[in-house]
Amino acid sequence: MSKRPTQLVQTNTPSDGLVRLWMLRILVKLKAHKNFLDVMGYENSAIASYLGLQRAEEFCDETIDTSSLEFNFDAKKALAAMRQGHLRAEKNSANYHVQPELTQNIKRLSEVVLLNQVEIDLLQFTVILNTHSLLDNVADYLGGMSSTELYRTLTVLLGHSERD
C-alpha cells in the first residue's frame, strides 16, 4: 500500500459499489477515519468526493468565526455522515460485484490452482487494491500492522468470519 499521488479514478465501473463499501469499512469499521478526518476537514478531498461525502465546509460550526472555516470543521458530524453512508453500502452489498473480466480470469485461475472462496475474495481485493489508487490511499490510513492485525483487518474488510 504505497503512497501514490491522488488522481481521479474512472467512475461508474461495475466494481464502484464494492470499492466504496471496502473504503467505508476501512474508514468506519476499522476506524481509519481517525487519519482521514481532522480539524481542517478531509485529509483527501478526492476520496471524500468519490465516497459522495458532503463538502467539508458543510460540517463547520456556524457560530464560530467564519473567517477561519478550516479550524471549525466538525469531525463528529462528518463521521456520522460517513457511518450513514457505510450503513447504506452494507445494506446494498449484495448488489456489488467485481468487474466481469476479473471474475472470469480469477475463476479460470481458481480451477487450475483450486482456490476456495476466501482465497478468491483475497485475490480480487488485492488486484483491485493495486489498480484503484483511491482504495489504496484509504488503505494507507490503516498504517502498519502485525500479521494478526492484518488477518483481522482482511476478515472485517472482506466480510468473512475468522474461522474462514
Can you say where each PLM-predicted feature lies in the sequence?
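Intrinsically disordered, low-complexity N-terminal extensions of AAA+/P-loop NTPases
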Residues: M1-D164
